[in-house]
């Protein structure tokens, strides 16, 4: 029998206007809360009933998390900045061309208009296209990514604060 996915599980939606309000909501609701950026990935999880949060905290109304800001050390990109904004921003194109090109390769224009840099960097991937199908020696595979002739090193990155260095 096919699963009917005509409705999402019930949840309480909060749309805070500040980082402080969002933090307070997340502290109050703990593991029962889901943080939503652009929402593209979130709604799929909800409709498939894989994720069933009691509370959803939508960051879309927090203006301080949007946009690109030049800093003394480079460029700071807000977590709620759309991928389209990253692609089209003149300074990103000129000084961080690789980032602009990479953002432009994400999905379709419609998804780039809604998807955010923060949401894309923290999404809970479930698609094999986003996973490395080859495992390293430690995981029973036949390659060591940390020790190759090209010195390819696969290190995890923290996405809590993304600051790009200034191009020399």
Task: Tell me what each language-model feature is.
Residues 163-168:
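A short, hydrophobic C-terminal helix/tail in secreted or cell-surface proteins
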């Amino acid at each position: 029998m096919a699963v009917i996915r005509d409705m999402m599980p019930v949840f309480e939606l909060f749309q805070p206007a500040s980082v402080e309000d969002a933090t307070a909501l997340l502290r109050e609701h703990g593991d029962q809360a889901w943080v939503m950026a652009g929402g593209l990935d979130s709604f799929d999880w909800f409709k498939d009933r894989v994720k069933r949060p009691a509370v959803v905290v939508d960051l879309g109304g927090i203006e301080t998390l949007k946009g690109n800001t030049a800093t003394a050390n480079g460029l700071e990109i807000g977590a709620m900045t759309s991928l389209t904004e990253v692609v089209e921003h003149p300074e990103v194109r000129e000084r961080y061309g690789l980032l602009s090109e990479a953002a432009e390769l994400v999905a379709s224009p419609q998804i780039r208009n809604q998807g955010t840099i923060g949401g894309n960097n923290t999404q809970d991937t479930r698609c094999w296209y986003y996973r490395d199908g080859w495992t390293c020696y430690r995981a029973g595979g036949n390659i060591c990514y940390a020790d190759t002739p090209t010195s390819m090193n696969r290190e995890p990155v923290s996405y809590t604060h993304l600051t790009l260095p200034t191009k020399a």
